[in-house]
Amino acid sequence: MLKSGVMVASLCLFSVPSRAAVPAPGDKFELSGWSLSVPVDSDNDGKADQIKEKTLAAGYRNSDFFTLSDAGGMVFKAPISGAKTSKNTTYTRSELREMLRKGDTSIATQGVSRNNWVLSSAPLSEQKKAGGVDGTLEATLSVDHVTTTGVNWQVGRVIIGQIHANNDEPIRLYYRKLPHHQKGSVYFAHEPRKGFGDEQWYEMIGTLQPSHGNQTAAPTEPEAGIALGETFSYRIDATGNKLTVTLMREGRPDVVKTVDMSKSGYSEAGQYLYFKAGVYNQNKTGKPDDYVQATFYRLKATHGAQR
C-alpha cells in the first residue's frame, strides 16, 4: 500500500490525440514533471543532450534512444558508445530525471527547492522549501536487451531506477543478466554520503556477481530470475530514514528489502532528492554498438505535501 500524499509527478497511461505522424512517448504518458537525458550531443557542447520538461511533454522522441512501442510502452535505449551527461560520468544513459517544477524555469533545478524533495526526517525548515516530502516511485517494465560484450564484471548490467541526492545515490536499482544465462538478477546499492560510511549492496533476486571486487565469480543462473522481455514491477519508497525496495511479479511473492538510512547523512540540512528512471548502461568496455534497452509501461512518483 502506498502512503497517503500529494502526487507531484506521475506517468500513467491515458488517451490524448497524437501530436505527430510518428507517435512519441508524450502522446501516451504525462511527461511534464520529468526531463530526459539521451546519449547524443546534437548541440556540440560536449555533453549528452538534456530534453527539458515542456519539450519532452510536447512530443519529443528520438528514433534511436527514446520511442513509443507498438504496445504503448516508453522505450529507453543506451549503447556503450555515446555522449555522457558530465565529465565525471563514464557510462551512457537514456534516463528520466524527476522535475517537480514542471517547466517553471524560475525555480532552480538544484538545491532544496520546489523542484526537488526531502525526507520527513530533514529539518522542518527544509521541508517547507522543498517540492515534496518523502517519495515513492512505482514502475512496471521489461528489460529487453543487455550488453553481451566487455569485461565479465560489467557485462549485462543496467540501472533501471534511482534516487539521486546532491552528489550521491541513496539507491541505484540494477537488473543484470549474464550472457550464458536465460534469466537475470535484481539488486541495489545504497550509497551513504561521503564520510557517512561505505556503499552497501543488497541482492533481491540472484546475485550481483561477478563484480569489480570478485571478477572470477561464476554464479549459477538464478532460479527465480527475470528473463529479458519479462514484465515485472518495482517500488522504491523513502520515508524518513527508511528506504524500502519491493519487487513484484504476477504469480510470485513480493521480494522486499529495507535499509536504515539514519546514519547515511540524507536527513541533514541542504540535502535534496529526486527520482530517476530509464536505462543507465553500466558497461563501458564492450563493443561500441552493444546496448541496454527497457520498456516502461507504467511509472508513477508520489510525495507528501510540504509542511
From Swiss-Prot:
A Pfam family of the record is: Alginate_lyase2
- Principal location class: secreted
Instruction: Check the record and name the InterPro entries matching this protein.
Output: Alginate_lyase_2, ConA-like_dom_sf
On whether Secreted is a keyword of this UniProt record, the answer is yes
Enzyme Commission code: 4.2.2.3
Gene Ontology cellular component list = extracellular region
* Keyword tags: Lyase, Secreted, Signal
Q: Name one GO molecular function term.
A: poly(beta-D-mannuronate) lyase activity
How far does the signal peptide extend, from start to end residue? 1-20
Reactions catalysed, semicolon-separated, are: Eliminative cleavage of alginate to give oligosaccharides with 4-deoxy-alpha-L-erythro-hex-4-enuronosyl groups at their non-reducing ends and beta-D-mannuronate at their reducing end
Root EC class: lyase
Location of the protein in the cell: Secreted
Q: What does this protein do?
A: Degrades alginates that contain guluronic acid.
Q: State the family named in the UniProt similarity comment for this chain.
A: Belongs to the polysaccharide lyase 7 family.
Q: What is this protein called?
A: Alginate lyase
